[in-house]
């Protein structure tokens, strides 16, 4: 009898759901939307999921690439950021459309249309991508805590585990609270870099010219490598899974054509607006790198280098001050914290969607966090908290994102182009072929970037 009770408790803690379970069940359809309201009131109701998705496009993993791009080639790579952002808008709109029309997220759809063995394989690949994303966020947060409070890196890494408790509290308060907290953190990042760029006084005409693509991006090997880094970091695999799930947090009747159509319209507007904000932040990072570090011998390849440079008048000139350095660290912490919230949600979506593993929220999020914290902690202990060595881990973590990209993009384009799945909401011909072209280019660029990172291509 006692053994049966123990078995029952284990099954309650960890069990496998049937395939019909909803994505992020605790918040699915939890946000009411008006039915006969005007444009702005309706948009306000749908605004929120886009900001959670946009966070992935300005996480700590993107910072170094953008700033280094500006420091090395001034404003020339702004065009790459623009093109990358437009690609992200298209793919994220497709992810949201998939979730709204089918009521299934990308992980669930992929699992539904593959064998059990293939589903398990895809889960492992995607889980590694989540870990890679989380590693960048943990490292960014831990370094920010050290810069702000002189906290040992190992202690900072352990403290980031507490994000799980914050997320649990926010989930109890409602999904809109999560959206509000993340939006506040993103606003902090935007304001900090806008302020620092204004102080840096960039050359505006030259800056605007940087948004026009030019041949040097392809012909110059160093410029091409940094461009690949920017593009490779733009489309984050976990964001496609996340977007397809949280688009379902708005309560609609999928049997009513007009409600589905309206949900797609306003979710796409929300996504594009928030990704525009991410585009602005990434532009500001590159502009800051160009205005302050172009033509100097200063290294800006690491967070600590950037922090120190902002208070060094020999590098950044008269605007140098400890305040600029502190603001940079605050923005880094805000970026890390906002990204960990969305990364943990994506981890839950992927685990439940691919292998139908259902766990209590605290166990699910603790497991997701520990899977990412553990390798960083081991690395930090092994290298005695050396920042340079730990930031190298951040660089290599991006390789996993590149490996996982095809396993997210290809199914997304397949499912959203299939009329049997999407009905009349399937991709139009020009959207489908544009998406396939973009997917092919992204995959080739990422494979090339992997080969360069691992030293197979010089």
Curated annotation (Swiss-Prot):
GO terms for cellular component: plasma membrane. This is Divalent metal cation transporter MntH. It is a multi-pass membrane protein. It comes from Lacticaseibacillus paracasei (strain ATCC 334 / BCRC 17002 / CCUG 31169 / CIP 107868 / KCTC 3260 / NRRL B-441) (Lactobacillus paracasei). H(+)-stimulated, divalent metal cation uptake system. Its main location: membrane. InterPro entries: NRAMP_fam (IPR001046). Keywords: Cell membrane, Ion transport, Membrane, Symport, Transmembrane, Transmembrane helix, Transport. The keyword Cell membrane applies. The chain crosses the membrane at residues 38-58, 76-96, 119-139, 151-171, 180-200, 223-243, 275-295, 315-335, 370-390, 393-413, 437-457. GO terms for biological process: iron ion transmembrane transport. Belongs to the NRAMP family. It is found in: Cell membrane. One of its GO terms (molecular function) is metal ion binding.
């Amino acid at each position: 009898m006692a053994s049966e009770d123990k078995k029952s408790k284990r099954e309650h803690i960890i069990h496998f759901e049937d395939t019909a379970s909803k994505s992020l069940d605790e918040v699915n359809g939890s946000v009411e939307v008006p039915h006969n309201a005007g444009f702005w009131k309706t948009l306000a109701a749908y605004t929120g999921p886009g900001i959670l998705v946009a966070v992935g496009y300005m996480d700590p993993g993107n910072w170094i690439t953008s700033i280094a791009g500006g420091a090395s080639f001034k404003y020339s790579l702004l065009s790459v950021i623009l093109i990358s952002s437009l690609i992200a808008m298209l793919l994220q709109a497709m992810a949201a459309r998939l979730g709204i029309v089918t009521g299934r997220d990308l992980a669930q759809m992929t699992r539904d249309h593959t064998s059990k063995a293939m589903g398990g394989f895809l889960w492992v690949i995607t889980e590694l991508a989540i870990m890679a994303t989380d590693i960048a966020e943990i490292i960014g947060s831990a370094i920010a805590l050290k810069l702000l409070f002189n906290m040992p890196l190992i202690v900072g890494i352990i403290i980031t585990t507490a994000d799980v408790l914050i997320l649990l509290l926010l989930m109890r308060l409602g999904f809109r609270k999560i959206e509000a907290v993340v939006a506040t953190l993103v606003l902090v990042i935007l304001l900090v870099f806008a302020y620092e760029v204004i102080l840096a006084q960039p050359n505006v005409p030259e800056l605007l010219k940087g948004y026009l693509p030019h041949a040097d991006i392809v012909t110059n090997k160093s410029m091409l490598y940094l461009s690949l880094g920017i593009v490779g970091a733009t489309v984050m695999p976990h964001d496609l899974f996340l977007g397809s799930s949280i688009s379902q947090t708005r309560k609609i009747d999928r049997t009513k054509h007009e409600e589905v159509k309206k949900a797609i319209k306003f979710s796409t507007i929300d996504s594009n607006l928030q990704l525009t904000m991410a585009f602005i932040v990434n532009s500001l990072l590159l502009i800051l790198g160009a205005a302050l570090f172009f033509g100097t011998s200063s290294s800006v390849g690491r967070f600590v280098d950037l922090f120190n440079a902002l208070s060094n008048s020999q590098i950044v000139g008269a605007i140098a001050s400890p305040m600029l350095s502190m603001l940079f660290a605050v923005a880094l912490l805000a970026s890390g914290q906002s990204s960990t919230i969305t990364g943990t949600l994506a981890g839950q979506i992927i685990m439940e969607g691919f292998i139908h593993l259902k766990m209590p929220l605290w166990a699910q999020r603790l497991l997701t966090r520990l899977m990412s914290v553990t390798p960083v902690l081991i690395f930090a202990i092994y290298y005695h908290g050396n920042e340079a060595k730990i930031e190298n881990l951040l660089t290599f973590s991006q390789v996993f994102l590149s490996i996982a990209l095809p396993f997210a993009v290809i199914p997304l384009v397949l499912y959203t182009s299939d009329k049997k799945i999407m009905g009349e909401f399937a991709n139009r011909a020009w959207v489908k072929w544009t998406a396939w072209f973009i997917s092919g280019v992204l995959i080739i660029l990422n494979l090339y970037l992997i080969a360069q990172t691992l030293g197979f291509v010089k």
